[in-house]
Every structure is written in C-alpha cells, then in structure tokens.
Amino acid sequence: MTLRLRVEAIVEELLDELDRGGPPADFHATVAFPLPALVVCELLGVSAEDRADLCRWQVEAKQVSKPAVARGGLQSLWRYLGTLIERKRWAGDDDIISDLLDAAEPDPKLTDDEIAHLAAGLLFAGHAPVVAIIDRGMLLLLTHAEQREALRRDP
C-alpha cells in the first residue's frame, strides 16, 4: 500500500472518530493534533498497537512545566526507539528506520543512537507546524463558504 493510501486510511479513521463523538466536535483534538504523529509513526514503521503509547510519550516529553513528566516521557520514548531499531534490524520492513539500517550495512555510517535521534526529530519537528497548518486550513474552510463548496464538488 502506498504512503498516500496509508495516510488516507489514517485520516478516514480519525474523521470516523470525530463523527462518532457527535456535537460539539473537537477537530483539533480528534484530527489535527494526532494526525502528524500518526503519519510519522507510519513512516517509522511503528505498529498500530504501539502508536498510542508513542504519541503519549511525545506529548509528555514536551511538558516543560512538569520536568518529571517530561523526563519520564522522553525516557519511555527513547527506550521504545531503541527496541524498535533492534527489531527493525532483522525484519526487513519498508520504512525509514529499516532504510537507514540497510544503508548502514556493511559499514555502519549511522549508529543506533543517531538513528533514534533522527526518528525522534521527525516525531517532534514534524508535529507542531503540521498541526497548525491543519487547524488553519479548517478555519479557512469554515470561514470561506465558496472554498468549502469547491472542496465538496472536487475533493
């Protein structure tokens, strides 16, 4: 399945959850906020079962006003990434971590620690800006009826 189809499936799942929640709908919390992290999880090859934990640790790690929570989230995230990298080393999957591991053979150019840093960087750097763009896009659709209609006609 292509990345586009996998992302579309994630979006459909989140929109279904938004619909099930009924009014009032919280688009930000249900769709915009989780979507970027879930897509990065897809890119990294994180299993569906582990995604909620990974997303929670990412949120916890950013709790700068609660150092113990941030430290715990970061430690959990780091442990998980180490385990994931080790698992990917032998799995032969089609994801970014597997590609980085394959590129490092037979002469490792990247250490496991560097691969974990790259994965964490994608997770953190790819989150807040994308959430803001999704939220802004929804605001523009809600405030510009002609654009909303154009999207309905040609999704």
Residue ranges of each PLM-predicted region?
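Cytochrome P450
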Residues: 1-155
